[in-house]
C-alpha cells in the first residue's frame, strides 16, 4: 500500500475537519462522548432501560473497537461514553474525533482479518494510544469482529480485556455442521439436509436420494464465507467444477429451495436471548459483488416478515441462543434465517458467532433509539455490573418498534477484473441529490444516524487514494433510508433504480491508473479479500 497522501486527500482532510468543527455533529444530544462522569457508581442491579442508558453515558472504562474499518459499530459512541475505534483504514483522513489509525503503515500482505487486528494491537502507535491512563484506572476493554488465540495472548500481555467469547469456542461454533446439529437438538431445523463425506458424484447422489433431497442440491463446507464456500450442484458438470473443495471433508448437502434469506442479530445474556430486528439480505447482486450468492448488504423494512413469521423466526433464534449458552457462549451473534417462499417454512441458515455486517443497521433502528443499541447488552454482559431484565418484554417491544423502521445498506465491491491504483476516491460523509438529480457530497458526517429521508445517503470510504482496487476489493459502504431492492413478480430480488443510481454515482467518483495483473501479487489480493464480511 502507498500511504503517501496526494493533494486531493490533503484537501479532503482539511475540509472535513472544518466541517466537523463547525457543526453540532460531534456533540448532538444523543452523543455520550460529552456526558460527564458518574459521581458515584451504584452496584445494585440495573433493572430498566433508563438505568442502562445512564450507566453507559457515564461510563469511565475505555472501550475500543478494533478492525480494518469502524463500519460494524460505527455510531455506538453516541450512546457509550469512552467508546472509540482503532482502525487500519481511516475514511475521515484523521477528522473523526474517535477514530484512531496509525500513520505509519508499511506494506504488509495480510492473509486474514485476524492478522490485521493483531497487527493493530501490537503496533507502537496503537499501544501508545490505548495505554493512556483512564480516569477510572481500569483496564481497556477491546471488541472486534475477527480474532484468534494469538489475539487473546496479545490482549493478555498488554493488559486489555477482550470482551468476546473464547476463540476456541467461537471456532467450534462457527462450523456450519455444528450449527446444524445444535439446531436440530432444540427444534431449530435447517433446510432438509444430510451431513456426509463423499469422494465421487454418485456417492453424493445416493446420499441425497436417501435423504429425500432430490438432485438439485446446495453443498456447503464447514467453514468459510457463504458466497465462496456454497456450491450449487444439479449435475455431474457442477460436481466436477467444485469437487476439489468438497472431496474428503464432511459437508452439508441440502435440498435446493426457493428461499428468502433474512438476517437477525441477537445477544445471549445471563437473563436470556435478546433478539434484534430482522433484515432482508442483499446477496449475489452482480453490480455489487463478483461472488455468486455473496453477501453485499441488508434492508430493514416493515414487510421483511409477516407478524406470524417474525414470531416463529424469533422463537427459532431464542432456542438456538439458549442452546449456545449451554456450550458456554455469551454475547453477540448473528443468524441467517431462510424462509421457504413456497411453503412459508422458517429454517435455520447459518450462525455467525460474532459481530456481523448487519450490526451497522441494528444499532440505528427505532428500537435502538427508543431503548439502547443491541450491542449495549453485549457490553453489559462483559462489564462487572449486575442487571435484571425481563427479556420477553424487551423482545416483544423490539418486534413492534423494529417493524416500523426503514434502513438499507450496500457494501460496494470492485466487480471489474482490471487492477488499478486508486488516484481519486469519494469522501466519507453525507450525500444528497442536487436539482439535476446528481448525487453530490454535502457535508462531513461521523456516521449515518442523521439521515432523514431517501434523498440522503452516507458513504463510508474504505479504499482510497494509494490503495489498489481489484476484483472483489471493498471500496466502501453506502447507507440510506428506503429500499434498495425489489422483487418483480416471482423473480429474484433486483436492485432498484435508485440503488443503481447511488451505486453508479459512487463508482464514478473513483479514478485510477491501470496496472497489469502481474504487477500485483496474489498475496496482496488475498490480503484485501480477507476484509470482506
Language-model features, listed with the residues they occupy:
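ATP-binding N-terminal substructure of ATP-dependent carboxylate-amine bond-forming enzymes
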Residues: 1-168, 201-203, 492-532
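Short, charged, surface-exposed secondary-structure boundary motifs
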Residues: 96-100, 171-178, 286-288
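Active-site nucleotide/adenylate-binding loops and adjacent lid/helix of ATP-dependent enzymes
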Residues: 170-252, 257-258, 269-271, 298-322, ...
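Phosphate-binding site of ATP-dependent enzymes
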Residues: 231-288, 339-347, 400-417, 422-426, ...
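ATP-dependent carboxylate/phosphate-activation module, predominantly the ATP-grasp catalytic core
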Residues: 255-259, 266-319, 352-379
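A long amphipathic alpha-helix within ATP-dependent nucleotide-binding catalytic cores
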Residues: 294-342, 377-406, 411, 497, ...
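Peripheral (often C-terminal) accessory segments that flank ATP-dependent C-N-forming ligase machineries
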Residues: 380-533
Amino acid at each position: 500500500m502507498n500511504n503517501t497522501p496526494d493533494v486531493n486527500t490533503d484537501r479532503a482532510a482539511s475540509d472535513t475537519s472544518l466541517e466537523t468543527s463547525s457543526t453540532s455533529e460531534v456533540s448532538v444530544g444523543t452523543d455520550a462522548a460529552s456526558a460527564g462522569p458518574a459521581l458515584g457508581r451504584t452496584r445494585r442491579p440495573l433493572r430498566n432501560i433508563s438505568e442502562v442508558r445512564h450507566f453507559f453515558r457515564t461510563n469511565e472504562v475505555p472501550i475500543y473497537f478494533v478492525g480494518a474499518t469502524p463500519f460494524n459499530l460505527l455510531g455506538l459512541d453516541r450512546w457509550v461514553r469512552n467508546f472509540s475505534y482503532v482502525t487500519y483504514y481511516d475514511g475521515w483522513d484523521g477528522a473523526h474525533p474517535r477514530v484512531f489509525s496509525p500513520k505509519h503503515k508499511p506494506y504488509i500482505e495480510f492473509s486474514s482479518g485476524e492478522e490485521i487486528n493483531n497487527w493493530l494491537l501490537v503496533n507502537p502507535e496503537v499501544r501508545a494510544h490505548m495505554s493512556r491512563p483512564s480516569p477510572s484506572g481500569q483496564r481497556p476493554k477491546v471488541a472486534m469482529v475477527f480474532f484468534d488465540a494469538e489475539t487473546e495472548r496479545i490482549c493478555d500481555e498488554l493488559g486489555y480485556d477482550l470482551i468476546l467469547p473464547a476463540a476456541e469456542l467461537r471456532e467450534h461454533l462457527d462450523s456450519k455442521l455444528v450449527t446444524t446439529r445444535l439446531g436440530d437438538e432444540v427444534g431449530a431445523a435447517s433446510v432438509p439436509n444430510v451431513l456426509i463425506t463423499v469422494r465421487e458424484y454418485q456417492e453424493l447422489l445416493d446420499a441425497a436420494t436417501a435423504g429425500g433431497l432430490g438432485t438439485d442440491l446446495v453443498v456447503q463446507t464447514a467453514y468459510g464465507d457463504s458466497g465462496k464456500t456454497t456450491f450449487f450442484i444439479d449435475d455431474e458438470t457442477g460436481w466436477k467444477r467444485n469437487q476439489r473443495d468438497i472431496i474428503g471433508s464432511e459437508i452439508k448437502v441440502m435440498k435446493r429451495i426457493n428461499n428468502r434469506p433474512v438476517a437477525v442479530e441477537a445477544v445471549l445474556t445471563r437473563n436470556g436471548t435478546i433478539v434484534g430486528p430482522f433484515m432482508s439480505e442483499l446477496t449475489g447482486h452482480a453490480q455489487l459483488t463478483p461472488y455468486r450468492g455473496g453477501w453485499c448488504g441488508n434492508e430493514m423494512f416493515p414487510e421483511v416478515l409477516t407478524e406470524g413469521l417474525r414470531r416463529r423466526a424469533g422463537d427459532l433464534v431464542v432456542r438456538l441462543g439458549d442452546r449456545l449458552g449451554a456450550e458456554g457462549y455469551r454475547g453477540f451473534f448473528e443468524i441467517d434465517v431462510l424462509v421457504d417462499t413456497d411453503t412459508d417454512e422458517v429454517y435455520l441458515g447459518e450462525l455467525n458467532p460474532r459481530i456481523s455486517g448487519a450490526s451497522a443497521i441494528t444499532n440505528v433502528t427505532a428500537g435502538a433509539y427508543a431503548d439502547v443499541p443491541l450491542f449495549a447488552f453485549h457490553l453489559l454482559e462483559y462489564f462487572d455490573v449486575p442487571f435484571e431484565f425481563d427479556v420477553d418484554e424487551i423482545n416483544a417491544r423490539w418486534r413492534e418498534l423494529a417493524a416500523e423502521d426503514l434502513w438499507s445498506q450496500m457494501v460496494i465491491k470492485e466487480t471489474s477484473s482490471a487492477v488499478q491504483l486508486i488516484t481519486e476516491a469519494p469522501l466519507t460523509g453525507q450525500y444528497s441529490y442536487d436539482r439535476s438529480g446528481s448525487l453530490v457530497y454535502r457535508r462531513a458526517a461521523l456516521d449515518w444516524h442523521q439521515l432523514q429521508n431517501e434523498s440522503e445517503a452516507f458513504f463510508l470510504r474504505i479504499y482510497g487514494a494509494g490503495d489498489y482496487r481489484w476484483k472483489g476489493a471493498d471500496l466502501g459502504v453506502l447507507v440510506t433510508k428506503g429500499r434498495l431492492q425489489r422483487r418483480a413478480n416471482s423473480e429474484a430480488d433486483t436492485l432498484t433504480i435508485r440503488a443503481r443510481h447511488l451505486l453508479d454515482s459512487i463508482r464514478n467518483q473513483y479514478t485510477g491508473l491501470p496496472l497489469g495483473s502481474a504487477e500485483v501479487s496474489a498475496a496482496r489480493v488475498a490480503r484485501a479479500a480477507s476484509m470482506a464480511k
